[in-house]
């Protein structure tokens, strides 16, 4: 199971720092990472379209907030949306969203199984941690998870 997470995390770390031409790019904002994660959760695949209203409901935000985030994520090449159509992730957007989701799931599992937090508290904490820890720290977390068999 850890190998599955490691694959997504490595892909995430690559996409987070390097563009197709090999240049360094800025990390997607924490808010936009949450949108990508939510779209992956709602769609389940790269090709499954997702409605803006469903994203708004899942995230507890307004449709206007979703529209603003979608515009920004379209401009960064993470998703596609025809004029007033459903939202579909690009390959890069899907990989990034999957990596964030897997990172979140792994941290949640650790907080529940090894730290003893309730599922609800662990979910909230993992959501904060997935954005806050550095890539270097997370690589060390991965190594630790491997050692303890998580």
Which residues are covered by each model-predicted region?
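Short alpha-helical segments that sit at the start of domains
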Residues: 8-37
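N-terminal helix-turn-helix DNA-binding core of bacterial DNA-binding proteins
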Residues: 26-61
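Helix N-cap/coil-helix junction residues
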Residues: 61, 116-117, 150
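Arg/Lys-rich, alpha-helical DNA-contact motif
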Residues: 101-129, 134-135
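Canonical helix-turn-helix DNA-binding module
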Residues: 52-83, 91
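Basic, amphipathic "hinge/linker" alpha-helix immediately C-terminal to the N-terminal HTH DNA-binding motif
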Residues: 85-104
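C-terminal regulatory/oligomerization modules of transcriptional regulators
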Residues: 1-18, 124-150
């Amino acid at each position: 199971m850890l190998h599955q997470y490691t694959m997504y995390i490595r892909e995430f770390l690559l996409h987070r720092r390097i563009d197709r031409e090999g240049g360094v790019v800025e990390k997607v904002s924490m808010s936009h990472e949450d949108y990508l994660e939510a779209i992956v959760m709602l769609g389940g695949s790269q090709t499954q379209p997702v409605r803006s209203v469903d994203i708004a409901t899942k995230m507890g935000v307004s449709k206007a907030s979703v529209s603003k985030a979608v515009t920004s994520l379209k401009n960064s090449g993470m998703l596609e949306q025809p004029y007033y159509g459903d939202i579909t992730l690009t390959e890069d957007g899907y990989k990034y969203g999957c990596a964030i989701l897997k990172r979140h799931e792994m941290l949640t599992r650790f907080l529940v199984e090894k730290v003893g937090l309730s599922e609800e508290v662990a979910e909230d904490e993992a959501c904060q941690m997935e954005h806050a820890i550095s890539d270097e720290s997370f690589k060390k977390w991965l190594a630790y998870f491997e050692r303890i068999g998580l």
